[in-house]
């Protein structure tokens, strides 16, 4: 068995604002010629060497990188102290490129969004439930961390409420499987996480990625 690719530190910042009908988040469409091309994502990217000077821990580097990436990709300057780390995503060992990605939530700063037209080609503000619906309708493409984040945010009416709900970042160390021809990603509390037996009973923490994606979680 070949060794898994090394984990590369990275970060993402979800910029949210309080709209008339609940939280709205800033989403960006990646250049179709790049990795994850055409996907709708949140601002973010890998940790650069200068980011590591901000502290001794990876999460501190990621916070600095998120501020830098948001400025580069959107023109918005995020106050580091306003950011709450709410999740940490680790890809499966079979992934060709593995980014150890910290997700932060912050109130969107005032100002006009200006995308760089290099890595990012388009932006939109969307309610999480609307973005999820557009994915199911085939209008936009999402990756699982983005989908799960949107699903989580759909349960809140304000950014502050979402931030206050965070006790500590939740770790999503991802494994993959299939139910017939349907891809499934799962995390530590799922009964199939170790065994791979996706049809077995027991606790669930998985995303079933059929035509309509379905999140199953039993806490």
Can you name each region flagged by the protein language model?
Residues 1-120, 125-219:
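N-terminal leader/linker segments that precede catalytic domains of diphosphate-processing enzymes
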């Amino acid at each position: 068995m070949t060794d898994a690719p090394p984990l590369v530190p990275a970060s993402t910042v979800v910029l949210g604002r309080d709209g008339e009908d609940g939280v709205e988040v800033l989403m960006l469409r990646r250049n179709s010629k790049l990795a994850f091309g055409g996907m709708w994502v949140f601002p973010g990217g890998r940790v650069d060497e200068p980011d590591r000077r901000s502290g001794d821990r990876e999460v501190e580097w990621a916070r600095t990188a998120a501020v830098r990436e948001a400025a580069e990709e959107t023109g918005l300057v995020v106050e580091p102290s306003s950011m709450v780390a709410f999740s940490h995503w680790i890809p499966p060992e079979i992934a060709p490129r593995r980014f150890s990605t910290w997700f932060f939530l912050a109130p969107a700063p005032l100002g006009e969004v200006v995308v760089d037209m290099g890595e990012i080609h388009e932006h939109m503000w969307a309610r999480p439930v609307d973005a999820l619906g557009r994915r199911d309708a085939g209008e936009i493409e999402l990756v699982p961390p983005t989908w799960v984040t949107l699903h989580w945010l759909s349960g809140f009416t304000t950014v502050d409420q979402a931030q206050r709900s965070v006790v500590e970042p939740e770790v999503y160390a991802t494994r993959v499987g299939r139910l017939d021809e349907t891809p499934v990603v799962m995390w530590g509390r799922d009964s199939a996480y170790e065994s791979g037996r996706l049809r077995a009973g027991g606790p669930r923490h998985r995303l079933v990625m059929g035509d309509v994606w379905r999140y199953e979680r039993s806490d």
